[in-house]
Amino acid sequence: MGQKIHPTGFRLPVTRNWSSRWYANNRNFAGMLAEDIEVREFLKKKLKNAAVSRVTIERPAKNARITIYSARPGVVIGKKGEDIENLKLELAKMLKVPVAVNIEEVRKPEVDAQLIAESITQQLEKRIMFRRAMKRAMQNAMRLGAQGIKIMSAGRLNGIEIARTEWYREGRVPLHTLRADIDYGTAEAKTTYGVIGVKVWVYRGDRLANGDAPVMRGEDRPEDDRRRRNPRGDRPGDRRGPGAGRGGPGAGRGPADGASAAPSGDAKPGVKRVVRAAPPAAKGE
């Protein structure tokens, strides 16, 4: 059921990591989880034009550390760092603890699934044909290093009366392979006909457990450098014949009694002649 389950949750113990990294007891867990959801919704609205890919939240020792991954870090920081300072104050008021905000730049937004989904929804809201937007995003992703991409759009596409689902795929998208680095993102386009949902899967190669080291494939493995051993009969100084040392019944024996040796080449095998003895004469004859 790799096609139905959430790709990130499916790979959490293997190649992915949690977006919220903290520990809480049973009494405080629900409240802290609700705060994380509230912070993410606030940042999504506040930084709508900053191309935010994802947000990670850490809570070390009565503090909070929030990392924002954005393709436009300058929009988040603002002029002379004013916007990020105001953002820290608002987040500290929400979480009621000191907050440190870090900005990480997304180098290739064309390969980020969340940014691809948001880009397609923005084009759909501007009345651009959904097929054109999807195929353009797929071409850009494959050109910049993605090994596979799948995009699905669902809703009243092109304003039709009955909602439907269409998807396109290019390259490989192995959803069942746990070591595959599958990036997944969703977004919604609010059009005059209704809401259109967009889902994006991007395959960026294979990874080892929670690391960036690529997995060596079968065709990329180096050849075995060990020196292969020659057959026993070809070894120098071996006085035994090529068939010596073989086990099994009849090993080392010559031909059976009364049987001719095995023919060599194209010579026809000899025919064994059988002579029957005459029966003994009856008594009294």
Swiss-Prot record:
Q: Which UniProt keywords apply?
A: Ribonucleoprotein, Ribosomal protein, RNA-binding, rRNA-binding
- Any one Pfam family match given in the protein's UniProt record, by short name: Ribosomal_S3_C
Does the entry feature the keyword DNA-binding, yes or no? no
* Record-level GO cellular component terms: cytosolic small ribosomal subunit
Report if keyword Iron-sulfur is assigned.
no
InterPro entries cross-referenced by the UniProt entry: KH_dom (IPR004087), KH_dom-like_a/b (IPR015946), KH_dom_type_2 (IPR004044), KH_sf_prok-type (IPR009019), Ribosomal_S3_C_sf (IPR036419), Ribosomal_uS3_bac-typ (IPR005704), Ribosomal_uS3_C (IPR001351), Ribosomal_uS3_CS (IPR018280)
User: Which family does the record claim for this protein?
Assistant: Belongs to the universal ribosomal protein uS3 family.
Name of the protein described by the UniProt record:
Small ribosomal subunit protein uS3
